[in-house]
Design a protein with these regions (language model features):
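Short, structured patches in soluble enzyme cores that scaffold and shape functional sites
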Residues: 120, 136, 153-157, 166-168
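Non-heme Fe(II)-dependent double-stranded beta-helix
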Residues: 2-35, 41-134, 139-142
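A structural signal for well-ordered alpha-helical scaffolds and beta->alpha junctions
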Residues: 98-102, 148, 182
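Conserved hydrophobic/aromatic beta-strand scaffold that supports enzyme active sites
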Residues: 37-39, 150-154, 206
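Short loop segments at secondary-structure junctions
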Residues: 42-44, 126, 155-159, 169-171
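Short, conserved beta-strand element in jelly-roll/cupin
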Residues: 142-159
Length: 208
């Protein structure tokens, strides 16, 4: 896997500053620090979303050697994943440099600098049965510390039943065992070295 890239040094246009003043408040930043998640609606323009969608189409047409299918052969759909392509797919490179996401990350982390660790494409085709299991992102990465942000950006309408969910405050720890999505294997840490995730689905009221 490529090493994390250097901080993007391209000056951010003034129009991004204006957009963030309208979309990201001090209360939002405090809420993100408390809950570990924040929904920012209409942050991206239709043209920016279209650019990302074009990049995903290019990625599907020519997957990298890191790509994998996270659904079983008998699944009527397909769950496709690929990583670390922003330097190889022009649309991804433009999306990273020409949208306000770096500034959003900087403000939410309350950091002076921002480094891009990787891009991660996930595509579930219609009819896919494979669910994305509950998990923490942090233990999958080769980094420590609290200044780490994942941004989930849907390019198609997503129903409430299929949308991303979070357990508020779970980012504050403890770290829980990361496992492969399809076969539940522990590949990042030795088995038993971290606590396993609780069964969130069995007791949703306990995990708001």
């Amino acid at each position: 896997m490529p090493q994390p890239s250097s901080a993007l040094d391209t000056p951010l246009p003034a129009r991004f500053q204006q957009r963030l003043q309208e979309r990201l408040t001090a209360d939002d930043i405090a809420r993100f620090d408390r809950d570990g998640a924040l929904c920012i609606k209409q942050l991206l323009t239709p043209d920016e979303v279209a650019l990302l969608r074009d990049g995903i189409d290019a990625n599907l047409a020519a997957p990298s050697p890191r790509a994998k299918v996270a659904s079983r052969p008998d699944d009527p759909g397909r769950f496709f994943e690929d990583f670390c392509n922003w330097q190889d797919i022009p649309q991804f490179g433009r999306f990273v440099r020409e949208t306000p996401l770096a500034l959003v990350a900087q403000r939410l982390m309350q950091s002076r600098t921002v480094r891009l660790y990787h891009d991660h494409v996930l595509v579930k085709e219609p009819g896919t049965r494979q669910r994305t299991p509950w998990h923490q992102d942090q233990p999958y990465y080769n980094i420590d510390g609290m200044q780490n942000i994942s941004m989930w950006i849907p390019v198609d309408p997503v129903s409430r039943a299929a949308t991303l969910e979070f357990v508020a405050g779970s980012h504050k720890g403890p770290w829980l065992m990361p496992r492969t999505f399809m076969d539940n294997q522990a590949k990042w840490f030795p088995e038993g070295s971290l606590q396993d995730l609780p069964d969130v689905e069995a007791d949703r009221a306990a995990f708001p």
